[in-house]
Design a protein with these regions (language model features):
Chain A
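ABC transporter nucleotide-binding domains
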Residues: 2-6, 11-205, 211
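Broad structural signal for hydrophobic residues in well-ordered alpha-helices, predominantly aliphatic
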Residues: 9, 97-98, 218, 274, ...
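Alpha-helix N-cap/helix-start and coil->helix boundary motif
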Residues: 10, 68, 91, 191, ...
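A short local loop/turn or secondary-structure capping micro-motif enriched for an aromatic residue
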Residues: 70, 219-220, 267
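ABC transporter nucleotide-binding domain
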Residues: 172-258
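Short, charged/small-residue-rich alpha-helical element at the C-terminal edge
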Residues: 224-300, 304
Length: 304, 437
């Protein structure tokens, strides 16, 4: 089942089309990567889900009910542009945000304490936001986003400005939230940063969806039967169906060779031939990155 | 509504807890008290006698010249040159030298001093001299002075206002003071707290909290929560000011009053000042003054309309200020948008004199019904009694006015707060105003 279903979303601004007839379905308990370059329309779409702005056309349903003010409490949103009240204490701040999301006071305080324990920051309650480092503020922002235990968590460029330690911490939390049944939408233009996390991916460019589906399917779809080989002595000749694309020395007598296998051949057969000719150090399939897939698809569209 | 309340409470508590709020709240009444004390102090110390030496060669003025405004004339009979030296070396403050003059054309009267005399001093001396010359002329012409004096008649017009239920004696002096005071309070309130709304909105925008907020509350609720929260802060501060100022004046006032000129002798002879304050005479005077205010001004109407214009005027302008805060990216950008909002406020202040001179005239009428001016101008007019229909019209327009500005501000606000780095001018603002959701 899908937690969110968007049909034919179109949004126009004065001088350009931000989203054009976008269909998206976010499956339950999954991590969904909404990928695309800057200006593709990602933030516009996220703002529409959060009812900050409204679509010109199209419908959105959450758990099969049309999007309404009632859904605010089940969504947690960490926008790309995020800040905190500098003069407020961390505890007050989290309490305020949680109450705006409909949580009552006692429950909110209880949960804040749980999160503080989890992040090992028990003495932050009375600290002023302005006394926190940037990394610390990011933790607070993340807690504020998930404190009301939203079923749909929307993170816009979540790792921009995060140091690697915090980024990993947040990644672990996100995986745990998915285990608990939440769905997470990740939006980013740095595709490599979320590739490993996502179950589903949608690529959008200039307001148009160009690809959409489970990550594994997309990757399979874009497999080119290309293998990478690291070996010592040069390869003499390969039988029909195997074609050397490139071959170059990398270091200390080691050579890297890229080989294309025809559809009717098997990788194992290639490996057997190779073992007869040279000493094989590594052998692996070249799987295209999301970034490569994106560039390839955009190019194909431009030509086709 | 719950969320407006949450926002309101946050705005209120975060501001009221600030040190600057506490400082302003408790220091301002002290400052007012201090100014009040200083004014009294200078009024008292200014009444010291100023002794001016007079050389009168005409003999016309001797023992007839009466000083005014704490000036005392002392006649001396020494040569002008030596007297001038005494002025130069500081033993005389001032020297008035009257030659042997012709009373029909008194020329060549000189005043010597080491400082340029104030206009009051010169005028006072002129009057003193003129009175003596006049008396001399009357004598010369052969009129009796008492016959002439009987030509002067004192007339006091008692103005009676017939518009109320009972005839009552109007007192335009007190009406004026009450009107100006309440108009000024409203002006200050709108300006100080209006610009706080603007700054608050701007800070939320520039520190980028706003997008998180509007994913939880509607932009209009966010704006209203802020406007109302700051209004509550302002009201708290005003009430505290009034309470504190009244208590400071009621404690310090009598103490200072005891030192004032009235009963300095008594004070010097060792009567405790506190006792003085409780003297029935002083109390009666105070009661009489209060009575006069109560009699000449319709208090319930005044208080009622004060709170009405106080709040509606604030709401009217705060919405406009919120709109500015939402469209700009920095404090520096606010200037160009502030001007049109400040203009009607400043104009209201500039026309204050005109309104007081003619509180029922056309300018007063128009300004008191147009919402941009009416909170200040109508408050100035009310103590002078305003026809009911004008008051109702003004209040109706005021309510429509703030509903209008709030609606307008809400529409610009919802777009503006999410726009960063956009070059905003009035055309863009108008486009946002007209933009559908």
């Amino acid at each position: 089942m899908d937690i969110l279903n968007a049909q034919g979303i179109t949004k126009r601004y004065a001088n350009h089309l931000a989203l054009s007839n976008l269909d998206l379905a976010i499956p339950n308990a999954s991590i969904f990567g909404l990928l695309g370059p800057n200006g593709a329309g990602k933030t516009t779409f996220l703002r529409i889900i959060n009812q900050i702005i409204f679509a010109d056309e199209g419908t959105i349903t959450i758990e099969n009910r049309p999007l309404s003010q009632n859904h605010i409490e089940m969504i947690g949103y960490l926008p790309e542009e995020r800040g905190l009240y500098k003069k407020m204490k961390v505890g007050e701040h989290l309490l305020y945000f949680a109450r705006l999301k409909g949580l009552n006071r006692t429950e909110a305080i209880k949960r804040i304490k749980v999160w503080f324990k989890k992040f090992d920051i028990p003495d932050w309650l009375d600290k002023k936001v302005e006394d926190l480092s940037k990394g610390m503020q990011q933790k607070v922002q993340f807690i504020a986003t998930v404190l009301h235990e939203p079923k749909l968590i929307i993170l816009d460029e979540p790792f921009s400005g995060f140091d690697p330690i915090n980024a990993n911490l947040i990644k672990d939390e996100i995986l745990e939230l998915r285990e608990k049944g939440s769905s997470i939408i990740f939006s980013t233009h740095r595709m490599e940063s979320v590739e490993e996390l996502c179950d589903h991916i949608a690529l959008i460019n200039e307001g148009v969806k160009i690809l959409d589906g489970p990550k594994r399917d997309i990757k399979n779809q874009f497999r080119d039967n290309i293998y990478s080989l690291e070996h010592l002595t040069p390869i003499k000749e390969l039988p029909d169906g195997f074609e050397i694309k490139t071959s170059q020395k990398i270091d200390e007598g080691m050579t890297e060779t890229i080989i294309h296998i025809a559809d009717n051949q098997k990788a194992n057969d290639l490996l057997q031939v190779l073992i007869g000719q040279t000493e094989v150090r590594s052998f692996s399939e070249v799987i295209p990155s999301i970034n490569d897939i994106f560039i390839k698809t955009v190019k194909e569209q431009a030509h086709g | 509504m719950d969320k407006i309340w949450l926002i309101l409470t946050r705005e209120y508590t975060s501001r009221v807890k600030k040190k600057s709020f506490l400082l302003a709240t408790f220091l301002t009444p002290l400052l007012m008290g201090g100014l009040y004390a200083a004014a009294i102090y200078f009024a008292v110390s200014d009444s010291e006698e100023k002794i001016i030496k007079v050389i009168d060669e005409s003999g016309l003025f001797v023992d007839k010249l009466e000083g005014r405004n704490s000036v005392v004339f002392e006649f001396v009979t020494e040569p002008v040159d030596s007297a001038r030296k005494k002025v130069e070396n500081g033993s005389f403050i001032g020297l008035l030298y009257i030659k042997d003059v012709d009373i029909d054309d008194p020329q060549g009267i000189n005043y010597y001093s080491m400082t340029t005399p104030g206009i009051d001093l010169i005028r006072g001396m002129n009057r003193s001299l003129e009175t003596v010359v006049r008396d001399a002329k009357i004598k010369k012409m052969g009129f009796s002075k008492s016959a002439l004096d009987s030509l002067n008649t004192d007339i006091n017009i008692t103005s009676i206002n017939l518009s109320g239920e009972n005839e009552k004696e109007g007192n335009s002096g007190i009406a004026m003071a009450v009107g100006i005071f309440s108009g000024m309070l409203i002006y200050m309130f709108m300006l100080i707290y209006g610009s706080q709304v603007m700054r608050g909105v701007m800070q939320e925008k520039t520190s980028k909290i706003v997008e998180i907020l509007v994913s939880s509350v509607r932009p209009f609720h966010l704006m209203m929560g802020k406007i109302l929260g700051i209004a509550a802060v302002g009201l708290t501060q005003f009430i505290l000011w009034i309470v504190l100022t009244v208590s400071i004046i009621s404690i310090a006032g009598p103490l200072l009053g005891g030192e004032s000129a009235e009963d300095m002798v008594a004070a010097q002879s060792g009567i405790a000042q506190a006792e003085l304050a409780q003297s029935p005479e002083a109390q009666n005077k105070l009661l009489a003054a209060i009575d006069e205010v109560v009699d000449s001004v319709n208090i319930p109407l005044l208080v009622g309309s004060f709170f009405f214009y106080f709040l509606s005027g604030y709401l009217f302008y705060a919405a406009l200020f919120a709109m500015i805060g939402a469209v700009v990216d920095s404090e520096a950008d606010t200037q160009q948008f502030m001007m049109p909002i400040m203009l009607p406020l400043i104009a209201s202040m500039m026309f204050l004199g005109v309104i007081i001179k003619d509180p029922s005239g056309p300018i007063a009428f128009w300004m008191s019904i147009i919402p941009f001016f009416s909170p200040i101008i109508m408050m100035i007019r009310i103590p002078f009694d305003v026809p009911l229909w004008q008051l109702v019209l003004s209040m109706t327009l005021m309510v429509l006015g703030f509903l209008g500005t709030t609606w307008m501000a809400g529409r610009v606000y919802r777009i503006g707060i999410l726009m960063h780095g956009a070059k905003v001018n009035y055309k863009v603002m108008f486009k946002w105003l007209m933009m559908k959701n």
